[in-house]
């Protein structure tokens, strides 16, 4: 895990396996099926990193040999909230890691001015819960900011929110940091820039279209 001095709340997971799989996702000739599988695999691998600091307590269990106080995650419950639609492709990878997590959904689409338009919010109970928001791309940053806004408006503490993405543009990370400097943003790659159409360069194209095999 490394950081960029420009963005104090940004954490980049530079594990070789993650970078290898991300390269294959970037390839324009990668099939929809393979793209989908790689997205799930990368998200699972990133999940190990982003859950590294979950609070731990002990539980008394009986092994076949003895009783022992063994570590378990303390108190707080997990919720996975994909930002629709591309975020759906990441939720399965996180559920592979934490199958007991609750799942919510935040639906937004990008208007002509690139601002997010909300069309759906479905969340589990909020009390004493850690939320992992997921979306493959942080391009302009507006959708990511909006997703965090949804939780903060419902009084979810910033310390209980994490946002995980595959690739991000510096412009979007700056927007996210300006709006939510108290929320950690985890990515696999900080790419070069946004082009005139607000696509991340080099990026991996439209993650939703590549995930579902549709055309914009």
From Swiss-Prot:
Keyword field: Allosteric enzyme, Glycosyltransferase, GTP-binding, Magnesium, Nucleotide-binding, Transferase
SUPFAM superfamilies xrefs: PRTase-like
Catalytic activity from the UniProt record: UMP + diphosphate = 5-phospho-alpha-D-ribose 1-diphosphate + uracil
Pathway terms, separated by semicolons: Pyrimidine metabolism; UMP biosynthesis via salvage pathway; UMP from uracil: step 1/1
Modes of activity regulation: Allosterically activated by GTP.
Domain of life: Bacteria
Cofactor(s) needed by this chain: Mg(2+)
Enzyme's top EC category: transferase
HAMAP family: Upp_B
Protein name per its UniProtKB record: Uracil phosphoribosyltransferase
